[in-house]
Structure formats: structure tokens, C-alpha cells
UniProtKB/Swiss-Prot annotation:
Its cofactor is Mg(2+). This is Catechol O-methyltransferase. The chain crosses the membrane at residues 3-19. GO terms for biological process: artery development; behavioral fear response; catecholamine catabolic process; catecholamine metabolic process; cellular response to cocaine; cellular response to phosphate starvation; cerebellar cortex morphogenesis; cholesterol efflux. It comes from Rattus norvegicus. GO terms for molecular function: catechol O-methyltransferase activity; magnesium ion binding.
């Protein structure tokens, strides 16, 4: 019995140390995504992403992107947490779009289309957004979301893995260089895909990289690279994790051209 108590105590201590290491933001995400959501899906007989789309279709105004964003934010605040960029960080994204007025934007990670709607609604006539999404179900929901918002002509959805699609952009999708890249996919892909964009000649002097979730869940290797390279000028925007009072942030990295990876 004492041995069992000691073992339990050590297990609890290890769990607490793990939680401290991960941070409560990641723990909260884990709880929502891997505990509550599967139970909810089982009870409802559908997926969270389908429920978000249905809520938008029932509560937003067709052809009105702002009402689509507000409906998604309402659902994710009041009903189920979801990994959209959210309104707090979304306002930072809006400011960046307005400042640089990009003609060609690449988004890595579409999810349900929230950020695609958010960016596309601010693009100038003739500008376009390419969004890459590996999950075919998410890609289908993003297309329906864009159709409902009336933005389908501004956005092209590319279904597949970013590392496979990026090398195809020049020949298959008529891309010379990109004006802006929004990174919001797998966090361990931020750095490899940034390097791949450089290697493929898709970045020009002045290309804006805007990366979400650089604090939670965090992208330490990406931040170390862009902040430590004279190829980028970086600005950090502190904010909150979507729909939570957990500190997160966006990183803006403006490409300066190829150079030494170490700043002098």
C-alpha cells in the first residue's frame, strides 16, 4: 500500500511537471480537442467543423464576409473552441493586409476558412489568395465557407501537403513570387516550409511572412531562424490565443533577400 501511494505521488508529480513544461494553454487545447470534442462528435453524429459551417449558414448573411466571421467567432466563443486565428489576432492580420495591400497571398493551413475569409475580404480587385489544406474534409468546408461569403472567385484551395504543393506553385499555379505568406498549419512545418519557399524562389525582397501561434503551441525553431537571420526583419505582435485569455502572438518577418543566416 505505501508503495502504491508513493507510485501515485510520483505519477502526479510527473504530470504536474509535464503540465508546467507544456503550459496551461496547450493543456487547455488538449482538453478541448482530444477529450471534449470526440465525445461531442459521438453524441451529435457529426464533426465540429460541420457544426461551425452549419451555424454560419443558419446565422450569417450570404455574401457578407463580416457576418461570416462574426458567426464563427460567436460559435467558438459560446459553444466550441476551434483553432481559427480569432478576432483578437485577426485584427492584427487585418492591419497587416491593409498596410501591405498584397496582390498574391499564400496561406498555409485553411482549416474551416476563417482566415481565408478574413484576408480575402480585404484584398484589392484582381488580387488572389492561394490556401493550402492537407485535410480534404477541411478543404471542402473551407470551399463552402468561401462560397457562402461570396469570396470564391478570390481564393483557390489547394488540397495536399505544403511540402508537396510549394514546389508546384511556379509552374502549375502561375506564381512568380509571393507578396505575403500566412503560416497557420502544423507548427513543425513553419521552418521547413519557410526554407522551402526560399529554395523555390518564391520570396522576393519585401515578401511578408505572418506566422500565427508562435507562443502557443509555439514555434521556437522558426522564431530562432527568422530572428537570427539577416534575411528577415521581424516584428512580434503580442495577443491572445483564439477565444482564450492565454498569451499568444503573431510574428511578422519581412524578407530582405538571401544573406548570411547569422546577424552580425
Amino acid at each position: 500500500m505505501p508503495l502504491a501511494a508513493v507510485s501515485l505521488g510520483l505519477l502526479l508529480l510527473a504530470l504536474l511537471l509535464l503540465l508546467r513544461h507544456l503550459g496551461w494553454g496547450l493543456v487547455t487545447i488538449f482538453w478541448f480537442e482530444y477529450v471534449l470534442q470526440p465525445v461531442h462528435n459521438l453524441i451529435m453524429g457529426d464533426t465540429k467543423e460541420q457544426r461551425i459551417l452549419r451555424y454560419v449558414q443558419q446565422n450569417a448573411k450570404p455574401g457578407d464576409p463580416q457576418s461570416v466571421l462574426e458567426a464563427i467567432d460567436t460559435y467558438c466563443t459560446q459553444k466550441e473552441w476551434a483553432m481559427n486565428v480569432g478576432d483578437a489576432k485577426g485584427q492584427i492580420m487585418d492591419a497587416v493586409i491593409r498596410e501591405y495591400s498584397p496582390s498574391l497571398v499564400l496561406e498555409l493551413g485553411a482549416y474551416c476558412g476563417y482566415s481565408a475569409v478574413r484576408m480575402a475580404r480585404l484584398l484589392q480587385p484582381g488580387a488572389r489568395l492561394l490556401t493550402m489544406e492537407m485535410n480534404p474534409d477541411y478543404a471542402a468546408i473551407t470551399q463552402q465557407m468561401l462560397n457562402f461569403a461570396g469570396l470564391q472567385d478570390k481564393v483557390t484551395i489547394l488540397n495536399g501537403a505544403s511540402q508537396d504543393l510549394i514546389p508546384q506553385l511556379k509552374k502549375k499555379y502561375d506564381v512568380d513570387t509571393l507578396d505575403m505568406v500566412f503560416l497557420d498549419h502544423w507548427k513543425d512545418r513553419y521552418l521547413p516550409d519557410t526554407l522551402l519557399l526560399e529554395k523555390c524562389g518564391l520570396l522576393r525582397k519585401g515578401t511578408v511572412l505572418l506566422a500565427d501561434n508562435v507562443i502557443v503551441p509555439g514555434t521556437p525553431d522558426f522564431l530562432a531562424y527568422v530572428r537570427g537571420s539577416s534575411s528577415f526583419e521581424c516584428t512580434h505582435y503580442s495577443s491572445y490565443l483564439e477565444y482564450m485569455k492565454v498569451v499568444d502572438g503573431l510574428e511578422k518577418a519581412i524578407y530582405q533577400g538571401p544573406s548570411s543566416p547569422d546577424k552580425s
